[in-house]
Amino acid sequence: DTARNTHQVDLTLHLLPYKTYVGDTPKEHFQYKINKINFITDYDVLQSSALSSIEINDSLHYNGFPIYYKDKLYLRPKVLVDNLRFASGDLYDERNVQKTYTYFGRLSALKYTNIRFFETQNGDSTQLNCYVMLTKSKHKSISFELEGTNSAGDLGAAASVSFQHRYLFRGSETFMVKFRGAYEAISGL
């Protein structure tokens, strides 16, 4: 009973051997290791998700990581590698994949992140090739705001214009400038 004394449970878990189909002979469960990690920085979520349909014009290698891009690499390679929470040779761990999603989600230069794993084609099915596919957000934005006020019968108006650049130095830094002007007519003076 867990409600008394130690508040602990003795639990034993028995995993049955893996079977691909019902009639197959049982085999041990595989431990998957990450083989190769690739970055694709100009992934379009509205197009086909097949890797062969992604348009790639250029690539570079940074610390053993191939980075594929279409026209111009909009993030420094160090930013991409530093936000990755797993490495080649690691055992597959879903927690590290979720941490990677969280880290890339914090970068304002990125709109979407998709991480896909494929078993290698060279006979060893316990190796996974990883593709980190990134979709950039709009890098520049301009906004205009109007505001009207009425406090104790005094009328006023304000306007502001703001400019935002999401990756000015290619590190997902956010640069923002805002200009605001206001006028209020004071009655009774």
Annotate the PLM regions:
Residues 1-150, 154-156, 162, 176-187:
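Periplasmic polypeptide-binding modules associated with outer-membrane biogenesis and secretion
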Residues 138, 169-171:
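Short coil turns and loop connectors of transmembrane beta-barrels in diderm outer membranes
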Residues 165-167:
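Residue-level signature of outer-membrane beta-barrel architecture
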